[in-house]
């Protein structure tokens, strides 16, 4: 048999023998612990349930909100005006300042040597377009007009007069064009659309109330008469006091003159074409009826 424990083991056993035994008499919560109070019956909301003694407040027969005892209430007495009438159907345009556009160009997120449209702006994280929230594109504003130095061919949906002047002063070109919600979703997210294997649809024409804006050369509308653009550019240059550059002698003249057809969504891709992402090919329709439909 083993002999009696000696050293540290013996001292540990002696210490345990002297400790009190665990029993109901010496149990207590841990230091810092909190036990939720138990709510007995009839506590806080007992007897009258907090409604008081009799009357309409206890019986729940109080008049509705806005009732004034029988007289004409305030919300009917005062006439209303439709300031917000049709607010859920109004078109919204995300602002894009010239300062922001110059910033995107300086970082290389937008290529000024190519025509700039919504596809470039969205892919460069310059703007966020949400067609489901009534976004209809981008509005070019004049903030940063004094510091804008890039020469660009940009297509937006709305543009202020000073923003147009700032771009044309540097030899650039501005075009305002309308996109219906379906075309807007496709031009902002081209890759998911191409992966579906569907033909590129025709872009719809603007509604009746927007036709005057997009047919005016002063707004650089895409439906305006091209013969009126030189006169409108010269008139704007005289108004703001700058010399209009001759873009016909510019080495980027071909890029600056590139414009989309009113029915076209992408640069270089016509309606009716199918982009095959797997084989990296473009399929074009050959049927006469399809060609007639997509060119009409």
UniProtKB/Swiss-Prot annotation:
Annotated compartments: Mitochondrion
GO cellular component: mitochondrial inner membrane; mitochondrial large ribosomal subunit; mitochondrion
Composition-biased stretches (Basic residues): 36-52
SUPFAM superfamilies per record: Ribosomal proteins L15p and L18e
Residues in coiled coil: none
Assembly mode: Component of the mitochondrial large ribosomal subunit (mt-LSU). Mature mammalian 55S mitochondrial ribosomes consist of a small (28S) and a large (39S) subunit. The 28S small subunit contains a 12S ribosomal RNA (12S mt-rRNA) and 30 different proteins. The 39S large subunit contains a 16S rRNA (16S mt-rRNA), a copy of mitochondrial valine transfer RNA (mt-tRNA(Val)), which plays an integral structural role, and 52 different proteins.
GO MF term list: RNA binding; structural constituent of ribosome
The keyword Transit peptide belongs to this UniProt entry's keyword annotation: yes
Transit peptide per record: 1-21
GO biological process: cellular response to leukemia inhibitory factor; mitochondrial translation
Signal peptide (residue range): none
Main localization of the protein described in the UniProt heading: mitochondrion
Cross-referenced Gene3D superfamilies: 3.100.10.10
Source organism of this protein record: Homo sapiens (Human)
Gene coding for it: MRPL15
Protein name stated in the entry: Large ribosomal subunit protein uL15m
Family the entry assigns: Belongs to the universal ribosomal protein uL15 family.
Region called Disordered, residue ranges: 22-66
Record keywords: Mitochondrion, Ribonucleoprotein, Ribosomal protein, Transit peptide
């Amino acid at each position: 048999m083993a002999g009696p424990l000696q050293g540290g083991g013996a001292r540990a056993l002696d210490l345990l023998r002297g400790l009190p035994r665990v029993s109901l008499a010496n149990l207590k919560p841990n230091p810092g612990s909190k036990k939720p109070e138990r709510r007995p019956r009839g506590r806080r909301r007992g007897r009258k349930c907090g409604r008081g003694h009799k009357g309409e407040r206890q019986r729940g027969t109080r008049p509705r909100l806005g009732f004034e005892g029988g007289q004409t209430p305030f919300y009917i007495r005062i006439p209303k005006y439709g300031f917000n009438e049709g607010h859920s159907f109004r078109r919204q345009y995300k602002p894009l300042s010239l300062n922001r556009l110059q910033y995107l160009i300086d970082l290389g997120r937008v290529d000024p040597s190519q025509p700039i449209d919504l596809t470039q702006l969205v892919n460069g994280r310059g703007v966020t377009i949400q067609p489901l929230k009534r976004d209809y594109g981008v509005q070019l504003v004049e903030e940063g007009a004094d510091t804008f130095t890039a020469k660009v061919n940009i297509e937006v949906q709305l543009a202020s007069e000073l923003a147009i002047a700032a771009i044309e002063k540097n030899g650039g070109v501005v075009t305002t064009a309308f996109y219906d919600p379906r075309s807007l979703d496709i031009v902002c997210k081209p890759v998911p659309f191409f992966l579906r294997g569907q033909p590129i649809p025709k872009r719809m024409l603007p509604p009746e109330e927007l036709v005057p804006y997009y047919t005016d050369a002063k707004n650089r509308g895409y439906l305006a008469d091209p013969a009126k653009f030189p006169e409108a550019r010269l008139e704007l240059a005289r108004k703001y006091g700058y010399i209009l550059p001759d873009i016909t002698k510019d080495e980027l003249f071909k890029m600056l003159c590139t414009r989309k057809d009113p029915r076209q969504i992408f640069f270089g891709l016509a309606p009716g074409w199918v982009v095959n992402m797997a084989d990296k090919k473009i399929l074009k329709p050959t049927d006469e009826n399809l060609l007639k439909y997509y060119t009409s």
